[in-house]
Amino acid sequence: VTGQTYTNIFPTANFNFTPARSKNLRISYNGRTNQPNVSQLQNVPDATDTLNIRIGNPSLKQEFNHNFNIGFNTFNVLTFKFIAANINLSTTKNKIVSSITTRGPVQTTTYENVNGYFRAFSFVTLGLPFKNPKMKGSSINVTNNMSYVKDVSLVNTKQNITKNISLSQGAGVNINKEKIDFGVKANIAYNNVKYSIN
C-alpha cells in the first residue's frame, strides 16, 4: 500500500491602484499546490506494454507553484489613446516530471521532483488614434509579446534543460466610420528553442 500525506497551502495577495479614472495598476500573487496522482506514487511496475514500463515513486513531493502578475492600463477619453501592459512570472518548486530511461528496446518511465522551472510572459499594446477629425474612432494598434520558458526534464537520469524564447510583433489599422468598419493586421514572430542534451 502506497500512501502520502500532503498539506495544501493557497496564499494570495492583491494590490490595486487607480490614481485616475482612466489609469489602473494591478499587482497580484498566488501560490498553489499540485499533488502527484496514484499512478505516479505507486511503486508497482506497469508492464502492460512490455516495451514501455511505468513505475511510480512513493517519495514524490507535491509541487508548489508561485505566480506573480503585474498589469497596467491607461486610456485617454479625449484622444482615445490607450496603453495596456502585463507581465506574468511563474516558477514551480519540486515540479513532478517523467524520468525516462532507455535500455535497448525497453523504455522505463518513473517520476521525480526537480527544480528550475521558470516562465515569464509580457505584452504591451498601444492604440494610437488618427488626429484627423474625419477619422475619429479609427486607430493604429501596435502589440508586442515576449515569452521565456525554462523547463527541466530527465533523460537517462540526466537533466535536460530546455530554454524557449518567443517574440512577436503585430501592427494593425482599424477604420471605423459611419458606413465603413474595416481592419487589417500583420504579425511577425520569432521562436528559438535550445536543449542542454542534444
Description of each model-found segment:
Residues 1-198:
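Exposed, low-structure sequence patches enriched in small/polar residues
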